[in-house]
Amino acid sequence: MTIEEIISEIENMSVSQLAELVKALEEKFGVSASMPVAVAAPVAGPAAAAPAEEEKTSFDVILKEAGAKKLEVIKVVREITGLGLKEAKDLVESAPKPIKEGVTKEEAEELKKKLEEAGAVIELQ
């Protein structure tokens, strides 16, 4: 398989499939795709926040339940993940499920706020 063929296959993957691929590559090769993001985060934020983030730099945003306003939650999930309507609906209906994995604390808090405003119950891990 050529590099172009691999890239073509990756381009056709959904966001959730890409997340699974990244996780599998991280486990297979013992690396972390979130490390460059974690290194860049303290530079953008205040210096005082850096020591607190050293303990846990990578967070998963988990949808525990959609709540009463499921349609609003589906819209936000589509916005966050880039999934199609059916994929986002399936994801929301199969909660608890990860919405986004390996994100910075700042991004995780922002996503949690958006989803909770739409009516979802969210957990950060």
From Swiss-Prot:
Alphabetical keyword list: Ribonucleoprotein, Ribosomal protein
InterPro entries the record matches: Ribosomal_bL12 (IPR000206), Ribosomal_bL12_C (IPR013823), Ribosomal_bL12_C/ClpS-like (IPR014719), Ribosomal_bL12_oligo (IPR008932), Ribosomal_bL12_oligo_N_sf (IPR036235)
Coiled coil: none
GO molecular function terms noted in the UniProt entry: mRNA binding; structural constituent of ribosome
Cysteines joined through disulfide linkages: none
Cellular component aspect of the GO annotation: cytosolic large ribosomal subunit
Gene Ontology BP, a term: translation
Oligomer and partners: Homodimer. Part of the ribosomal stalk of the 50S ribosomal subunit. Forms a multimeric L10(L12)X complex, where L10 forms an elongated spine to which 2 to 4 L12 dimers bind in a sequential fashion. Binds GTP-bound translation factors.
Record function comment: Forms part of the ribosomal stalk which helps the ribosome interact with GTP-bound translation factors. Is thus essential for accurate translation.
NCBIfam families: L12
Family: Belongs to the bacterial ribosomal protein bL12 family.
Protein name stated in the entry: Large ribosomal subunit protein bL12
